[in-house]
């Protein structure tokens, strides 16, 4: 496929241009096998008619592939000085990095949870939003309790994720924070609002394709955005405050990660 050809080319260029060994390993032994397995799982999804295991696994591999590509691109831009230089560590950098990393993990969990909602046909377990069939608290039916539980969990995690992203945005406003982290936190805040509204539209429109597809797309955008915030905040936390780091990207020691 085109994607596989591009990844093989990327792995070749990473080796030919003398990129760090970590980048070479990620491209050759990470991305290429992941995409191969993704293609195989895609066939399995069709063969067993969208079973929840294959659907969720297919999405998880796609998100991991997207995550590795995001890391390779962000790292290349940083090393080549084609983006805003990572500033030296500031007060609270390590804590900010932990918040960003935890938020990115929660985005991944929420995406997989959403695929389970789809796989178990739980998208309309409750047909109103923001209420649960007109009630403030969900009322569970013993026959459909598992599907209803998935639906409720997906909603609650969405609210928790929104709160974490807002907390990241507030924390990123502190002096000395990497401006890229500030911008990505602001973008993630906007994306999570759009994502929740699309989730509501899915229920109001009874899972029409014109809202379901954008819901998945915005989720992938949110995943990528949070990964950039997590990578950049980690690189800043790992940076050493020396005269060289202030000299710019051409002279600053690069973080090992």
Model regions: which residues?
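Polytopic transmembrane helical bundles with strong interfacial aromatic enrichment
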Residues: 1-257
């Amino acid at each position: 496929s085109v994607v596989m050809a591009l990844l093989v080319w990327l792995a070749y260029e990473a080796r030919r241009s003398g990129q760090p060994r970590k980048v070479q390993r990620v491209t050759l032994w990470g991305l290429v096998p992941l995409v191969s397995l993704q293609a195989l799982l895609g066939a399995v999804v069709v063969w067993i008619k969208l079973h929840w295991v294959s659907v969720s696994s297919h999405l998880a591999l796609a998100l991991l592939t997207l995550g590795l590509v995001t890391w390779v691109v962000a790292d290349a831009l940083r090393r080549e000085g084609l983006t805003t230089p990572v500033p030296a560590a500031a007060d609270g950098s390590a804590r900010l990095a932990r918040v960003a990393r935890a938020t990115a993990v929660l985005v991944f969990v929420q995406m997989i949870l959403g695929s389970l909602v789809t796989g178990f046909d739980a998208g309309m377990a409750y047909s109103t939003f923001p209420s649960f069939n007109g009630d403030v608290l969900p009322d569970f039916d013993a026959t459909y309790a598992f599907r209803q539980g998935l639906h409720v969990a997906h909603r609650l995690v969405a609210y928790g994720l929104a709160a974490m992203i807002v907390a990241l945005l507030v924390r990123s406003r502190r002096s000395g924070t990497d401006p890229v982290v500030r911008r990505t936190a602001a973008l993630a805040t906007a994306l999570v609002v759009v994502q929740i509204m699309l989730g509501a539209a899915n229920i109001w429109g009874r899972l029409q394709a014109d809202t379901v597809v954008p819901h998945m797309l915005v989720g992938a955008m949110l995943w990528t955005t949070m990964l950039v915030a997590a990578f950049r905040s980690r690189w800043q936390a790992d940076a050493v405050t020396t005269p060289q780091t202030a000299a710019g990207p051409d002279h600053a020691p690069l973080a090992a990660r």
